[in-house]
Amino acid sequence: MRCISINLDEDTMKKAFLGLTALFFAVLVSGCNQLTQYTISEQEVNQALAKHNNYEKDIGVAGLVNAHILLTDLNSQIGREEPDRVTLTGKAKINVTSLFGPQEADMQLKMKAQPVFDVQQGAVYLRDLEIVDAQVQPEKMAAVMKSLTPYLNQSLKSYFNQKPAYVLSVDRSKGEALAKKFAKGLQVEPGQLVIPFTQ
């Protein structure tokens, strides 16, 4: 059996050592991050938002126009369009009753909200929600929907002010259990929410 001899010069050894050192520190920093903060991904927020699908509400002006709203397909984009804000999209199915009889419309909504962490509840809320864009089909319903949008906005704002978008659980993972116990606030980064354990 032959033994293969490998001769490494000093420069190669230095490069290998530096590479291993960099890898060690990268792993160390990653481990430290897990001990000092918890990250909630966009995907996790969207999975939690799915629980708010099929939100239903009656809105309008009594005696003039009333609408039954069904909200579906909620999705979030975290800190991408605007720093420290969450952009939500969703579909609204609307059945309108007015002096002109029953009518139906579909709205594609775009909303923005401020993520806020409630330390006592261990929950993330989407506060001060605002509808920033609404596409209506059929187009002939656009004027009616425009008059109803402020009522829809207020209804959704009130709902998300009271209902958390994401609640930390001690059962899902050790990291999440630590976050629920030691969380100090909330930071918004593109694509994720970061909960630090220290001030």
Question: Which stretches of residues belong to each language-model region?
Answer:
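Extracellular/lumenal and peripheral-membrane lipid-interaction modules
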Residues: 32-199
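Short, Lys/Arg-enriched N-terminal segments with co-localized hydrophobic residues
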Residues: 1-12
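Bacterial N-terminal signal peptides that target proteins for export
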Residues: 10-20
